[in-house]
Amino acid sequence: MSLLIEQARYHLSAHNARQLPDDGGYEVAFAGRSNAGKSSALNALTRQNSLARVSKTPGRTQQLVFFQIQPERYLVDLPGYGYAKVPQDLQAHWQAFIDRYFRTREALRGLVVVMDIRHPLKDYDLQMLGYAAERGLPAHGLLTKADKLGRGQQMQTLQKVKKEVSSRFGDSVTVQTYSGESRQGVDELRGIVGGWLGLDVEPPADA
């Protein structure tokens, strides 16, 4: 399964609904606030150093970026939340686009919300988890940069976040700690994402 995920390649970028791929198959979306480590997590997941561009400019991702693993198997990089330098009309466009994507996209099978373990469950994170809950989709909270905290602090934050998401969203959200520096949690993330994409079993020959 991990070898399949490593086959991910850039497919297309969508600025509006007309540019999205056909709505079939399996997609897993990744969302995260600026500098939460979303691009780095995608690169670690696929064992590629530059699949998702890592930018020092907050909110640089201004489109839905699709990475194809196999036909009808995609990882989707959602726009980073960092719109301070973006005009209000463009902010409104992205809000409407993402809202429509979550409400109508049949191929969407799960959502990974990437959060800095030192600053979890901000308003944007809860909004994204809420989108998944409204659709009845599973979500996974990825607490990144775990190496910045001691083991005890990691576990304390993990339990606190688990308790909070459980009270808000029930058992539809799972949570883990993760570090790109030490590769802590990469295999766990692969298992979650691979399961949602149907990569834990052989896909149909005509997929």
UniProtKB/Swiss-Prot annotation:
SUPFAM superfamilies documented for this protein: P-loop containing nucleoside triphosphate hydrolases (SSF52540)
Entry-linked Pfam families: MMR_HSR1
Cofactors named for this entry: Mg(2+)
Listed GO CC annotations: cytosol
Entry's Gene Ontology molecular function annotations: GTP binding; metal ion binding
Keyword terms: Cell cycle, Cell division, GTP-binding, Magnesium, Metal-binding, Nucleotide-binding, Septation
Gene3D superfamilies for this protein: P-loop containing nucleotide triphosphate hydrolases
Domain EngB-type G: 24-199
Residues at which GTP binds: 32-39, 59-63, 77-80, 144-147, 178-180
Claim: Magnesium is one of the keywords in the record: yes
Domain of life from the UniProt record: Bacteria
Keyword presence, Cell inner membrane: no
Positions of Mg(2+) binding: S39, T61
GO biological process, one term: division septum assembly
Function: Necessary for normal cell division and for the maintenance of normal septation.
Record-stated family: Belongs to the TRAFAC class TrmE-Era-EngA-EngB-Septin-like GTPase superfamily. EngB GTPase family.
Protein name, as recorded: Probable GTP-binding protein EngB
